Amino acid sequence: MKMNCTAFWRTIHPDNIKEMEIKMRSVPILIIGGGAAGMMAAASAIEQGGRVMVIEKMAMLGKKILATGNGRCNFTNLKQQPEFYHVTGSDDVWKLLRRFDEKRTISFFKEAGVYPEDKDGYVYPMSMQAVSLRNCLGRKLDKAEIHFEEEVTDIEQKISATGKNTGFIVKTTKDKYLAKKIIVTAGGMAAKCHGSDGKCFRILAKLGHTVVTPVPALTWFKLKEKYTKLWAGVRVKGIIKAYDEDKKLLAHDKGELQLVASGISGIPVFQVSRYISRELEMSKRPYIEVDFLPEFSAEELYEELLRRKRCHPKLETSY
């Protein structure tokens, strides 16, 4: 086999590598993902005089914002305490959140023309439309260069001869960019239809980051029982408890439970779901208990059911 040594040298010679880099677009700050976090990051960088490029693989920015709060977007909460965050290392999370707390969040959007509406601590835009928040952030990105329907496929770290990080080569489905700094706000795996499909984890792991196996952390429960079809549409204030297979209480919460055709949902369910998800990820057999009538004792409930049976003998009281 013959090899053209001249051509080979021309390809790998440092001067040619530099020439290749010159042909790539140079970007001071490249943000991967144009969701809520990406838009906020871009707005903050622009306010400080940064030149920003945002790469978003969907056809619009902030698509997941539009689905938040059933289309109303509760963008912060006035009731915040460290114990509200069901995560490992909640103290560290709390410290980070205090750096840009609910007061600063409300002030940020109010100055941009979005006035808050308080609903029992949940803060919505006064219009009660998520699009108000999305458009507000969009206006702050007027000076950013935004690429739609372009997906990042790889990131390579540029290391100098002295071992110093000099930037990143970002490869996409359409081009290559030489970025001085990158901010990855690509989301997790929560909503593939909105762009969060988890592909970024592979790229981040390649760069040396530790990736904890992702599991659903805010989700509803699909139940195997057939009677759930009969309770679809019912909402009730109750208590839900999550247990491990050894009957140890993992978490509990109370509030409005939303009963759907194939299971159970609602904020209390979301609050305990991460514990069940993590147990299932470890191939264990956790379970839940639901108290639909916490104001009744077992004896009182039994007497109430007997009373109803006497008053309505033809009415079904069980499934």
Q: Which residue ranges define each predicted feature?
A:
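N-terminal amphipathic/hydrophobic targeting modules at extreme N-termini
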Residues: 2-15
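Glycine-rich FAD pyrophosphate-binding loop
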Residues: 46-70
